[in-house]
Amino acid sequence: MKRQFRHLDVPYRSQWGDPALNREIRNGCMDPCDDPAWRNTGFRDETAYRFWSRRVCGIACLESILDFLGIAHENRKRMLGEAIDHGVYEIDGEDSVKGLIYRPFCRWIRSRYRLNARIYEGAPLASVTQEISPTCMIMASVSPEIATPQQPNHRRGGHLVLIHGADAGHIWFHNPSGIPPFQCDANLAIDHAERFHAGRGMLIDFGEGANVPPRPNQPLTGPA
């Protein structure tokens, strides 16, 4: 029997500043540094922000999980610095980065935030989303083209989204670079989403041994 579960009220985090500006920035109509909220990320250098804001989808997904659980964390620039120090990103020259690299990411969030993570490979969404539970969400590798799923896609993978709910036929997810209606709490048929999916990602477990603080008076879950 297909497991059905959906987390409610998971905070959304854009990989830029103001989520309302995702469309303009994504489409190249707006300089990311013209968004007044960009300094809230901790960056002060415009060139560095422009470079990294295109590459921090995984950090944005992690922020959503931490904020949902009430786990304190640094600003995005400092989190990125820690991730680089732990080998999550490998900088190659002035304009190339390898990452987010899964294994060091899993080690980092375990040591830093006491979150357990398991890498999955070669698994379709219909299978892996059955792992979503009161103590588990999924960071899945998809094409950034999932922002406009009504359009044909030309690749799989290269971008991370946070899947926080699933039923027999659909997923619910946050896309850090998404545009409405496929941005926050986006709902998409699993079969449709699969064409963007690279078949890999990470299961983020905040259950036993994860040292998660209590969240009084806040519903953790809801029906799918």
Language-model-detected regions and their locations in the chain:
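Active-site-adjacent structural segments surrounding the nucleophilic cysteine of cysteine proteases
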Residues: 1-95
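Conserved active-site-adjacent core of cysteine acyl-enzyme catalytic domains
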Residues: 4, 66-223
